[in-house]
Amino acid sequence: MALSDYPFSVWSLPTEELAKRRGYQPTPHASIQEARQLLAEAGYAKGLKGVDFLVREAPDLKLRAEAIQVMLKEALNVETNLRLVQISAWFDDAQAGNFDLTIGAIVSTLMDPSDYFNSWYSKDGPQNYSKWHNEAFQRLLPQLDREADERKRQVLVRQAEDLLEQDPALLPLAWLKCNDAWYTYVKCPNPANFFGTYDVVRWDTAWLDK
C-alpha cells in the first residue's frame, strides 16, 4: 500500500509498480538492513529504549501494536512502552503530539485525493497527526483541486506520491476494506456509489420490496 492512496482506488499505483519501490518489496530483509544503517548513522546503532507507543483501547489495535512492538525489538532493537488509552483520549493526545509512535486513524469522506490529501497531509489538515509539512507538496494541493482532466490529475497524484516517498509523513500499516451484503428485498443500495463505513454512508433512498 502506498503512502498516498487507498490500494483499491483508481488513483493508486499498480501493485507490480509499487513492489519495485524501496520498502514495498515482498521480503523485508533489504528494508531492515537499511533501517539499521539509518539508525546507526543517527547515533542509535544499539537501538532505542523507552519509546512511547500510544495505542487506542481496542482489541484489534492492541493486537497490532503488540505485533509491531515485537517486530521493532527483533529487527531494530527498538524497545517500546505500550500506552493504552480510551479512544477519546487518543484523539486528544494525537492532536497534541503527545506520543513517539502511534497507530493512526486516517479516514476520508470521498475516495478522491483532493479530499484525503488535504485531510491527511496538508499543513493544517485535521488528520495530520505528525504535523508533517512539505512546501512542494503543499503547492501541489490547489493544482490538484482545480484540475478537472483525469489524466492530468493522475500526473499530479504521482508527483505528490514521489514527494511522500522521499519525505514520508507516516508509515502505512493497513487499509480497512468492507464488503457490503443485504437481502434481495432491500432495494436501491449501490456500493459502487458510496465509500466508507458507518460514519460516512447515508442511504437517501432505500425501500423494502416484500
Q: Can you describe what each PLM-predicted range is?
A:
Residues 1-17, 59-71, 91-210:
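Detector for C-terminal structural segments
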Residues 32-52:
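Immediate post-signal peptide segment of exported/extracytoplasmic ligand-binding proteins
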Residues 48-57, 81:
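Short, well-ordered beta-strand elements
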Residues 51-52, 83-92, 178:
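Acidic/histidine-enriched alpha-helical segments
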Residues 54-58, 85, 147:
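Short strand-loop junctions, especially beta-strand C-caps/beta-turns
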Residues 68-82:
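Short alpha-helix C-terminal cap/hinge motif
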Residues 81, 85, 103-105:
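Short beta-strand and adjacent tight-turn residues that come in two discontinuous sequence segments
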